Amino acid sequence: MELTHLDDKNRPKMVDVSSKSETKRVAVASGEIKMSKEAYQAIISNNTKKGPVLQTAVIAAILGTKKTHELIPMCHPLLLTGIDCDIEEIPQNNTFKLYVTARLNGQTGVEMEALTGVSIGLLTIYDMVKAIDKSMIISNVQLESKSGGKSGDFKR
């Protein structure tokens, strides 16, 4: 498979998508953060010094999704049509699982946007409770599904 972000002289480039037709595109990404019982309970009970952790993580995930093109060099600025976030509580493992769904009608996919949103949301949780638990583990950041575009659909 040819790398599309390199020109014929092996220099980096942003792919030209102007000849591609617009299609509806949706990507869902997820990731987890595992922590101590003390940190988990502080979040659940809204008893942290920095405020409402999960609500702030959702806002951060939305912002991260919107700002992906400013963080990942070869990502196109996109006109997103929607971003949804959901946080699953997994108390038996002191874990939160964050899902981000990004949507648009456009010429390129939104996988990187969904993945970036998840990453920023999880990092925000870490930042807000690191005073309680510095050993938190962020893991399993992954694409769950995508639809639309030339490469077709994907579902994990």
UniProtKB/Swiss-Prot annotation:
Keywords: Lyase, Molybdenum cofactor biosynthesis. The keyword Glycoprotein does not apply. GO terms for molecular function: cyclic pyranopterin monophosphate synthase activity. It catalyses: (8S)-3',8-cyclo-7,8-dihydroguanosine 5'-triphosphate = cyclic pyranopterin phosphate + diphosphate. Disulfide bonds: none annotated. InterPro entries: MoaC, MoaC_bact/euk, MoaC_sf, Mopterin_CF_biosynth-C_dom. Residues 1-21 are annotated as: Disordered. GO terms for biological process: Mo-molybdopterin cofactor biosynthetic process. The active site is at 127. Substrate binds at residues 74-76, 112-113. Pfam families: MoaC. The keyword Cell membrane does not apply. Pathway: Cofactor biosynthesis; molybdopterin biosynthesis. Its EC number is 4.6.1.17. Belongs to the MoaC family. Catalyzes the conversion of (8S)-3',8-cyclo-7,8-dihydroguanosine 5'-triphosphate to cyclic pyranopterin monophosphate (cPMP). NCBIfam families: moaC (TIGR00581), PRK09364.1 (NF006870). Homohexamer; trimer of dimers. This is Cyclic pyranopterin monophosphate synthase. The gene is moaC.
